[in-house]
A protein has these predicted regions:
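A short, N-terminal "cap"/entry segment at the start of jelly-roll beta-barrel domains
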Residues: 1-28, 111-118
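Conserved short histidine dyad/triad with adjacent acidic residue
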Residues: 17-22, 27-47, 79-83
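Structural motif
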Residues: 29-31, 51, 93-94
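Glycine- and acidic-residue-biased ligand/ion/polar-headgroup-sensing regions
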Residues: 38, 47-64
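Short acidic-glycine-tyrosine-enriched beta hairpin
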Residues: 64-83
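Double-stranded beta-helix
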Residues: 89-118
Length: 118
């Protein structure tokens, strides 16, 4: 698979796009490329139903409550149940995002499309 050949799918949260690379339907584990336009991010503190792993390929992405900033080459883990966020992309940012199970216990309010929470 050449990721450059896959189209970006706009999520229902403005400025956020994804390329789903792999998904296990039985466990809901995923690997995806996520692109945040400059100024986009997750607007509220939240938690995940599984472990979330992020590897930054390009840009600058900040967890504003803690000041953690991802830049190219940064790896970050949000353990299952750990409250984190909000976040903001200070420039266009692309990350590899991996979950080892379902993304959210329930669909967050900032997504109007149920598919965006999986």
């Amino acid at each position: 698979m050449q990721t450059r050949d896959l189209p970006w799918r706009a999520k229902s949260l403005k400025g956020v796009h994804e390329k789903m690379l792999w998904r296990d339907e039985s466990t809901e584990a995923t690997i995806a490329l996520i692109k945040f336009e400059k100024g986009a991010g997750i607007p509220q503190p939240h938690l995940h139903a599984s472990n979330q792993f992020m590897f930054c390929l390009e840009g600058r992405y900040e967890y504003t409550a803690t000041g953690v900033v991802l830049t190219p080459g940064s790896f970050y883990c949000n353990p299952k149940g750990n409250v984190h966020g909000p976040t903001i992309a200070h420039e266009e940012t692309v990350v590899v995002e991996m979950y080892d199970g379902p993304h959210y216990p329930v669909k967050p309010d900032w997504y109007s499309d149920e598919k965006d929470a999986h």
